């Protein structure tokens, strides 16, 4: 995982077609961004992998306040040994390439901001039980 500016760092990832996992591409530098819900991958890469634009003209607010629209599709996102299926944004020229919070959650990875790297988030929480007045679990 490559380090970059203050408090930020990049990581590499592999993006794969959900239906045909043989169709995949490595993305060497994604900015790890817990403030972004989605992972942003070059549209040209997603198109080459045969990933369909499932949601079109989805509105996004950029960090500078500008509103833009992009398409979103489904892909397998792999970082090291972890993987998840997630929605990915078809990033256009000039867009930052990002590894977003939803992918991080699905990968069960969290940010170690001191060491500027991704680390395992630990055991996943299971359902919790709440006791009701009649002692049945919900």
Residue ranges and their predicted role:
Residues 1-138:
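Pepsin/retropepsin-fold aspartyl endopeptidases
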């Amino acid at each position: 995982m490559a380090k970059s500016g203050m408090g930020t760092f990049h990581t590499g990832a592999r993006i794969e077609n959900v239906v045909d996992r043989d169709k995949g591409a490595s993305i060497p530098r994604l900015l790890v961004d817990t403030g972004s819900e989605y992972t942003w991958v070059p549209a040209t890469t997603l198109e080459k992998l045969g990933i369909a634009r499932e949601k079109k003209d989805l509105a996004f607010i950029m960090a500078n306040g500008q509103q833009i629209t992009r398409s979103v599709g489904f892909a397998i996102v792999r970082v090291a040994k972890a993987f998840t299926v997630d929605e990915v944004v078809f990033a256009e020229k000039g867009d930052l390439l990002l590894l977003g919070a939803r992918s991080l959650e699905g990968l069960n990875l969290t940010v170690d901001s001191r060491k500027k790297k991704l680390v395992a988030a630990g055991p996943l929480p299971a359902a919790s039980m709440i006791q009701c007045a009649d002692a049945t679990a919900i």
